[in-house]
Amino acid sequence: MARAPRWMLGWLLLACCVPHTEPLAVMSVDMGSESMKIAIVKPGVPMEIVLNKESRRKTPVAVALKENERLFGDSALGMSIKTPKVAFRYFQDLLGKQIDNPQVALYQSRFPEHELVKDEKRQTVIFKLSQTLQYSPEEMLGMVLNYSRGLAEEFAEQPIKDAVITVPAYFNQAERRAVLHAARMADLKVLQLINDNTAVALNYGVSGGKTSMPLHSFSFQNIMFYDMGAGSTVCTIVTYQTVKTKDSGTQPQLQIQGIGFDRTLGGLEMELRLRDYLAKLFNDQHPSKDVRKNPRAMAKLLKEANRLKTVLSANADHMAQIEGLLDDIDFKAKVSRQEFEDLCSDLFQRVPGPVQQALSSAEMNLDGIDQVILVGGATRVPKVQEVLLKAVGKEELGKNINADEAAAMGAVYQAAALSKAFKVKPFMVRDAAMFPIQVEFTREVEEDDKSKSLKHNKRILFQRMAPYPQRKVITFNRYTDDFEFYVNYGDLSFLNQDDLRIFGSLNLTTVRLKGVGESFKKHSDYESKGIKAHFNMDESGVLSLDRVESVFETLVEDKLEEESTLTKLGNTISSLFGGGGHTPEAGENLTDSVQEEEESLAEAAKEEQGVKQGQKSSAEDAGEEQGEEKQQSPHPDQAEAVPPKEESQKNEEGEKSEARDPKEDKETVNEEELSKSSGAGTAAKAEEEKKIKAPKKQKLVHEITMELDVNDVPDLLEDELKSSMKKLQDLTIRDLEKQEREKSANSLESFIFETQDKLYQEEYLFVSTEEEREEISKKLSEASNWMEEEGYAAATKELKDKLAELKKLCRNLFFRVEERRKWPERLAALESLLNHSNIFLKGARMIPESDQIFTEVELGTLEKAINETTVWKNETLAEQNKLSPAEKPVLLSKDIELKIAGLDREVQYLLDKAKFAKPKPKKEKNATKSDSGKNATGTSESENTIPPTEGKQEEKPEDISPAKEPPTTEKVVTDDEPGSDSSSKKEKKPEAGGESRKNDEL
């Protein structure tokens, strides 16, 4: 099993602030078209790929649905060969698609065995197996996600609720919402939908591929990732660099610069062409047969085509063979790599397409690309690599990341970063939205001839490749009554006609505002600052309208106050950067700045990742949007698109200003020019004016009711979501009950077969009678016959009751066998403990009374325990020997264990006391006297001090030795006169005998 590099362990640290009652593990699911990879992070497991029940690192995305059975993974894949109609694969292509979408027709042509019907409410697709079995693609995906969570929980050995799920970068809003619906059906909390190309880039940035150091330690780089999977191809250009932030200093960052894709270019299309070619060869060999009309035979051919494609990637030719393909006819045909490449020649011509799209969207050329790295299983096809290498003009293609697992590992790193249970080193991720989004509205305008007409206006909300997560505010200045506007996709001319047809509706949402007129009537004394619509594109790339507000403002006179020196300085700086005048336009600009700053603060509080947009890039994006607004609308005060962190071009310190109409901009520019010409004099004049009159702005926000109509693919209603959740939960409960029943049936069968075999083993024959064995054998035979005749339809409870009945019948026999197995070991342990206890007791009683550390009661208690245990052992053994082996034993292993524990407790008590006992004061006094006599009393002193330590050595030599010498030695040295070292050494010599005895005892 592969493990994360050692340096990566330092990137992932468990946070200590999370309550232990909450699940700590998080997971990621790389949901590919053909297979999925699951990864987890939990305490002690930094980042690991989950193994499925077959111990494989990737699991087929397949679901098999029968009347009373549901299979996943390899089991479902096997069912696709036996019963293709009930096995479903590649259904992710149908997410967020209505029934008339070309992608639905393509799916039907690829898999004609499935019946697709229309959902009358949403106009989407439903798989119909029967009148009672009908499932939507979201429900299918929900089943797979729930299954993946089960695998992750089993691998992590704890519950998991939080997940990061990968989606293709080209998924639009409807497709992303469909994945979120599926996750909710599976009761998964989605921390983020991360684009699979972004997950790969993050994994490469964190790990540095197969290099020894992570990429963030290197300099600025542009990397192109070419990902060809089973269903589609995506090419991504990523910029890696280190950036400085105020809060965290220097941090690594990746930014998605450009993306190109081909929805239908992948390994599956190659396999389908190879399948059709094999079918043609079979029909040529057997003209009277048509294998194309047999779904089961075509499923076998597709499986063989998958194997053949893999083998031909390493061999020039290979023999395709299938036993019993159709009507028990075997199929065998030789296929060369050249034939395979000819079949897919037009597919290989499409390989450079995503590269050119990515370069175009990034506004780069190939000279700016440092490396091209391959991702995805289909990139292993040699012809793909050959064409791609020629298209990018590099010396070689990078293969230094795991093409199958990079996305799952990058996603699980992001899951750990978003989870509250872990703390990871920050790696800033700036993803990009592929498709531009704009706001459209219609307003009545007055022409030169005083006539009125309707004018359609468009404002860009998110440019193509705009970074996200990001919040935007649109301000409508000319509306005083209820109105509606539309959120649609922007210019998609970069897509070809096929992609546009698959893309679906270009209209996202119709927003109707209620209560605008009432807010103006209610606050007629206030000055209107417009109707502000707050949009948010979250970490998953899903756009939402958070709220709509009607903003009003008025000036309130304050009493004159003496300004402090610091306030004067601040006002001077503000006047220099913001203009010195107090025209009404300047007042409006100041108000907008305050509102926008509040918005930015709200955004900062909401961002959970800590991913911050660079102020410079945000300012550039804002400038582009403002410029486009000016070009498209002759009445620019009708609406303004405002990025949340727009930086003023004049203020390098990050002051924020809201987009203004040309009139306001013009007047502001004039004020700035005046400020430059007048210099400090103008600033001083402005200070004097502020001293005379210092108005205070009072802002009032009125919430506007909004009604949303989804125009692309209608979302599931809350009741529909709950109904789907219950449907999936019922299926899960049914699966668990079925597994429990199968487990009970297997346990019963195993018990019957094992016990029938045991009855004639020697140890069972020895402890049983012929009558007992016959009775047990009869009951086992009856149970076996019952299993064959009725057991297949028996309920789980009935199976468990039958097993419990048989176990009860055999309980006494098994007990006698088990006891006799335990006797030798238990009795040997008891005998050993008795011997050691007797030796210890004898040694303790040999200690002179003057040095005795044990009381008579303590020694007597130990002696009593030894005697009682010995008597019990002898009497019980004698009584047991009188009994027949087939009778219930009186010598029980649990009783032996109790006796061992009781005796060991008494011995251990005395050993602990000896270990920590201190020499009596009498010994210290004798030692001092012996020191004064030195040579004359040296021998006598040694004799007085050695016996207690000898006693302790007999008790437990290895424990007493270190406790004996240091206290005695320290006492002698402390009491000695200076220069008595030689005497001390002489006094220690007799202890050598004690040490020798200690070694002998050991």
From Swiss-Prot:
A motif (Prevents secretion from ER) lies at residues 999-1002. InterPro entries: ATPase_NBD, Heat_shock_70_CS, HSP70_C_sf, HSP70_peptide-bd_sf, Hsp_70_fam. Keywords: ATP-binding, Chaperone, Endoplasmic reticulum, Nucleotide-binding, Signal. GO terms for cellular component: endoplasmic reticulum chaperone complex; endoplasmic reticulum lumen. One of its GO terms (biological process) is negative regulation of hypoxia-induced intrinsic apoptotic signaling pathway. It comes from the Eukaryota. Residues 643-675, 951-962, 983-1002 have a biased composition (Basic and acidic residues). Residues 576-698, 918-1002 are annotated as: Disordered. One of its GO terms (molecular function) is ATP-dependent protein folding chaperone. PANTHER family: HSC70CB, ISOFORM G-RELATED, HYPOXIA UP-REGULATED PROTEIN 1. Belongs to the heat shock protein 70 family. This is Hypoxia up-regulated protein 1. It comes from Gallus gallus. The gene is HYOU1.
